[in-house]
């Protein structure tokens, strides 16, 4: 392999200035000299003409160089919703087919690994399929593996590692890329620590939180200030990101106030004293899934549905007899008020509040569309309760199902199906029709893959919320009884399945079904991205990382 294929960053100092970085520094300098962008005390953006200057910089950027780096910076800072039109034009100017053909026929091997991997990642993220074969030219033909000389190119390895997380099933070369890049980045840490703690921290952070599987909502604040990233444009857009962070933070606080008042007003916290009372935590799911500030009403409405998933889960896990759970499930399947007459008052209250919430969501769509999603929403909630009931019967009879059977039911009992169906309805995109809703209702792979990620992460440590009692099954328990393996064997199998589920989810988001609008795809990805934070319990059954993020955001 010719040496010219490697990045010009052939040293263990990964962010050595280059012509590309100098270009970004010149743009930043020119922007600062011509703009008086600042933050008002109330957090508003001022003036509008300065926001237009940001857009103008993006419009004038070379789409094959600075434009892509700017998009990367904007996405990392979590302000891509401001520049949707400009980003779309830059991405559309790229041709995945042309990109591949040009690379395939280039016999000089001069492409920089960082640039190629960045372009590959951004095109795939925006629904343009680029074959993973483009990375074959970075392999040693004699050995059949990635050229070990690339280990010197820390910047390129970081970009390759980021790109590898958009792998779909059967792309062995991206599996190899992930292993190769991670191995050599980890090996570089000792040398990096000697002369630049910031750069070492950046590599460690990337290894732990690759962009595609992270939420910029939680990571963007770490980029504020002088950040030693490979992308100099982060410093250009961070002032705007700070303004937006403050503005959106105020919006989130207002939404939490609405959610907590609604939760108090419906009285379930007093009626169901055994159930979790965590409206802020429930809101975090909505905040993470629906990131565009304009979706304020949708976040509040989604949090209401999520609260019932938690409450009903606690009813099935901790409170009721099996006979009562059967009656409750029958009531949710028929939606007849006569079916709840024999239930305790607390379960009657829950049923009525759930029915009111579903009717409210359906009526909103009916007013806009002239048809109601009521039947679909009710059917989805009935499926959830039926899955909860299956688990309750397993526990009552001391039956431990086969691992496959447990996971198939667990995909439904995870509640992901309910959340994503509600999101699909709440987004109210032009693609929302009874036909597309029927399709989403019937558990397409974008839902089952996301649900598998949540169910397996939830079971990985078999932890519960602080102070929560009750009984739950676990994939670990089912696997060990069926196959006789150890806890470590079960967890290794679970991580493999999580990896496979991510590949399936990636495929759905890259090879896009017209039935799924981009905001729905993004919400599905964001749900999967939040899962590790929501289930990363410590030995005290607390979520310290999530609590830290909540404090910084709210």
Swiss-Prot record:
Pathway per the UniProt entry: Secondary metabolite biosynthesis; terpenoid biosynthesis
Binding site for Mg(2+) 2: 313, 317
Record's keyword annotation contains Magnesium: yes
GO biological process: diterpenoid biosynthetic process
Molecular function terms from GO: magnesium ion binding; terpene synthase activity
Annotated residues for binding of (2E,6E)-farnesyl diphosphate: 276, 313, 317, 455, 458
Tissue specificity of this protein: Highly expressed in glandular trichomes.
Cofactor(s) required, per the database record: Mg(2+); Mn(2+)
Comment, domains: The Asp-Asp-Xaa-Xaa-Asp/Glu (DDXXD/E) motif is important for the catalytic activity, presumably through binding to Mg(2+).
Similarity comment: Belongs to the terpene synthase family. Tpsb subfamily.
Motif (DDXXD motif): 313-317
Function statement: Involved in sesquiterpene olefins biosynthesis, constituants of cannabinoids and terpenoids-rich resins. Catalyzes primarily the conversion of (2E)-farnesyl diphosphate to (E)-nerolidol, and the conversion of (2E)-geranyl diphosphate to (+)linalool and (-)linalool.
Positions contributing to Mg(2+) 3 binding: 458, 462, 466
Gene that this sequence comes from: TPS19BL
EC number: 4.2.3.-, 4.2.3.26, 4.2.3.25
Enzymatic reactions: (2E,6E)-farnesyl diphosphate + H2O = (6E)-nerolidol + diphosphate; (2E)-geranyl diphosphate + H2O = (R)-linalool + diphosphate; (2E)-geranyl diphosphate + H2O = (S)-linalool + diphosphate
Note accompanying the cofactor annotation: Binds 3 Mg(2+) or Mn(2+) ions per subunit.
Disulfide bonds: none
Name of the protein in its database record: (E)-nerolidol synthase TPS18VF
Residues binding Mg(2+) 1, per UniProt: 313, 317
Lineage, opening ranks: Eukaryota, Viridiplantae, Streptophyta, Embryophyta, Tracheophyta
PANTHER family: OS04G0344100 PROTEIN-RELATED, S-(+)-LINALOOL SYNTHASE, CHLOROPLASTIC
Keyword Cell division applies: no
Organism: Cannabis sativa
CDD domains membership: Terpene_cyclase_plant_C1
InterPro entries listed in its UniProt record: Isoprenoid_synthase_dom_sf, Terpene_cyclase-like_1_C, Terpene_cyclase_plant_C1, Terpene_synth_N, Terpene_synth_N_sf, Terpene_synthase-like, Terpene_synthase_metal-bd, Terpenoid_cyclase/PrenylTrfase
């Amino acid at each position: 392999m010719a040496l010219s294929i490697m990045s010009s960053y052939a040293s263990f100092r990964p962010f050595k200035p280059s012509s590309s970085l100098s270009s970004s520094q010149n743009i930043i300098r020119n922007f600062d000299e011509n703009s008086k962008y600042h933050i008002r005390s109330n957090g508003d953006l001022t003036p509008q003409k300065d926001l237009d200057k940001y857009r103008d910089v993006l419009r004038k950027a070379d789409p094959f160089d600075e434009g892509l780096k700017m998009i990367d910076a904007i996405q990392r800072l979590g302000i891509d919703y401001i520049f949707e039109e400009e980003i779309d034009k830059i991405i559309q100017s790229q041709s995945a087919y042309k990109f591949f053909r040009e690379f395939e026929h280039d016999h000089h091997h001069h492409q920089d690994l960082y640039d190629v991997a960045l372009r590959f990642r951004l095109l795939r993220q925006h629904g343009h399929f680029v074959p993973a074969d483009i990375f074959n030219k970075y392999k040693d033909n004699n050995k059949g593996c990635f050229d070990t000389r690339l280990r010197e190119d820390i910047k390129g390895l970081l970009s390759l590692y980021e790109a590898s997380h958009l792998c779909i099933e059967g792309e062995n070369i991206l599996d190899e890329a992930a292993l190769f890049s991670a191995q050599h980045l980890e090996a570089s840490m000792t040398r990096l620590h000697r002369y630049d703690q910031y750069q070492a921290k950046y590599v460690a952070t990337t290894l732990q939180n690759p962009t595609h599987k992270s939420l910029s909502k939680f990571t963007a604040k770490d980029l504020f200030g002088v950040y030693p990233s490979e992308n100099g444009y982060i410093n250009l857009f961070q002032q705007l990101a700070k303004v937006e962070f403050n503005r959106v933070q105020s919006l989130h606080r207002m939404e939490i106030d609405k959610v907590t008042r609604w939760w108090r007003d419906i009285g379930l916290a007093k009626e169901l004293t055994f159930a979790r009372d965590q409206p802020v935590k429930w809101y975090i799911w909505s905040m993470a899934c629906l990131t565009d500030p304009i979706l304020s009403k949708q976040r509040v409405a989604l949090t209401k549905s999520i609260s019932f998933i938690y409450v009903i889960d606690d009813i099935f896990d901790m409170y009721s007899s099996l006979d009562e759970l059967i009656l409750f499930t029958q009531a949710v399947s028929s939606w007849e008020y006569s079916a709840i007459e024999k239930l305790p008052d607390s379960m009657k209250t829950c049923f009525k509040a759930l029915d009111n919430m579903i009717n409210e969501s359906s009526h909103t769509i009916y007013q806009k569309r002239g048809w109601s999603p009521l039947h679909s929403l009710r059917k989805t909630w009935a499926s959830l309760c039926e899955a909860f009931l299956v688990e309750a019967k397993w526990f009552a009879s001391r039956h431990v199902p086969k691992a496959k059977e447990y996971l198939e039911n667990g995909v439904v009992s995870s509640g992901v199906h309910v959340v994503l169906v509600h999101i699909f309805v709440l987004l109210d995109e032009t693609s929302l029709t009874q036909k597309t809703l029927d399709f989403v209702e019937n558990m397409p792979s974008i839902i089952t893959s996301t649900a598998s990620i949540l169910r397996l992460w939830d079971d990985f440590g078999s932890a519960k919320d602080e102070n929560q009692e009750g009984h739950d099954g676990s994939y670990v328990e089912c696997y060990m009884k069926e196959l006789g393996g150890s806890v470590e064997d079960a967890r290794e199998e679970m991580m493999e399945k999580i990896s496979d589920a991510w590949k399936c989810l990636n495929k759905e988001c890259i090879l896009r079904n017209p039935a799924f609008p981009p905001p729905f795809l993004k919400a599905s990805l964001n749900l999967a991205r939040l899962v590790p934070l929501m289930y990363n319990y410590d030995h005290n059954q607390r979520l310290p990382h999530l609590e830290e993020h909540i404090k910084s955001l709210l």
